[in-house]
């Protein structure tokens, strides 16, 4: 039989008391604050955002496409909007991308084909139509010069697709002059590009890298990852961040072709759909869990700086020291402290 005297009872009570309060009030000194600067009611779910100067292009889901002016960041002003019927589409808009050098806007009808919109004439929104193939999950646009661009698409059926357009000054039209289709080892659902490097996410099969050289696209390597590789953000030619849904996120240093890739997992207890990075700041889009912030302390150390429940977040982007969050609650603009 164990006898607990009054002194032992006292110390046991103190231990339980402080343990309880340490759980109730965690140490917040290393957490970052999200200060909300502005919120935009996008009518439909805000699925994606692309910022160019004072212009913010919004993929507003069932509400179509919108352009907002943020020259006064605390009071965004709607410049124009186009509904699905205006665009001649049926499904929600899931992505937007704008190229200021050629004043062309591109959007994606969810799981369908990209759409091309000409904004080169002031106060005019000229819908030029859709191109490439159905089952496009995501795309990237690369300008070749002021009269040419190439769209690279992650096609969930056929792999990596490219479509090159050139402007004919006589007809004043953009013509699709060439295209290519490169098979991948799995069905792509995400893409990113830097320089001549193209990387696809392949759901349960990780990622696959390609190189564009002398008008030819060749497969370079494949990296397997746990979970479902959903989206990729390339920060450098050999450093990538991959959102892997239930497995959180991975930082990958490829080391190609000399060494095996180095993988660092973080946010593994979260459901991650996208990774945004700016210098040492990392923002994970975590669907119903909002935004999770991380600090890239060093090449091999990434530390959590807190989870912020701001609603259901699809995608986030850093721009000019602001964080733009595309969410079901609309577009939200923050500063990190």
Segment roles from a protein language model:
Residues 2-11:
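Positively charged n-region of N-terminal signal peptides that target proteins for export
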Residues 10-19:
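Sec-dependent N-terminal signal peptides
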Residues 23-337:
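Feature marking well-ordered beta-strand scaffolds used for ligand recognition
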């Amino acid at each position: 039989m164990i006898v607990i005297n009054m002194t032992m009872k006292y110390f046991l009570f103190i231990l339980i008391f402080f343990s309880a309060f340490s759980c109730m009030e965690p140490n917040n000194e290393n957490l970052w604050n999200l200060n909300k600067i502005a919120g935009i009611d996008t009518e439909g779910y805000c699925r994606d955002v692309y910022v160019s100067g004072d212009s913010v292009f919004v993929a507003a889901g069932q509400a179509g496409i919108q352009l907002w002016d943020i020259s006064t960041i605390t009071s965004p002003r709607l410049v124009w909007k186009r509904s699905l019927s205006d665009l001649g589409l049926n499904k929600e808009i899931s992505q937007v991308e704008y190229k200021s050098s050629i004043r062309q806007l591109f959007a994606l009808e969810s799981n369908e084909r990209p759409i091309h919109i000409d904004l080169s004439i002031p106060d005019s929104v000229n819908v030029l139509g859709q191109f490439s193939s159905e089952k496009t999950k995501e795309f990237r646009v690369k300008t070749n010069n002021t009269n040419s661009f190439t769209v690279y698409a992650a096609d969930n059926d056929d792999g990596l697709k490219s479509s090159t357009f050139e402007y004919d000054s006589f007809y004043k039209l953009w013509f699709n002059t060439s295209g290519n289709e490169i098979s991948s080892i799995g069905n792509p659902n995400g893409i990113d590009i830097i320089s001549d490097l193209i990387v696809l996410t392949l759901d349960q099969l990780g990622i696959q890298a390609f190189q564009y050289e002398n008008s030819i696209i060749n497969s370079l390597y494949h990296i397997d990852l746990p979970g479902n590789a959903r989206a990729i953000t390339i920060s450098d030619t050999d450093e990538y961040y991959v959102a892997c849904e239930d497995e959180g996120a991975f930082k990958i240093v490829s080391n190609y072709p000399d060494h095996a890739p180095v993988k660092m997992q973080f946010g593994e207890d979260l459901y991650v759909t996208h990774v945004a990075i700016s210098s040492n700041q990392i923002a994970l889009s975590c669907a119903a869990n909002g935004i999770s912030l991380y600090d890239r302390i060093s090449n091999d150390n990434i530390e959590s700086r807190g989870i912020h429940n701001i609603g259901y977040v699809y995608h986030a982007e850093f721009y000019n020291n602001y964080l733009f969050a595309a969410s079901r609650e609309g577009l939200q603009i923050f500063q990190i402290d």
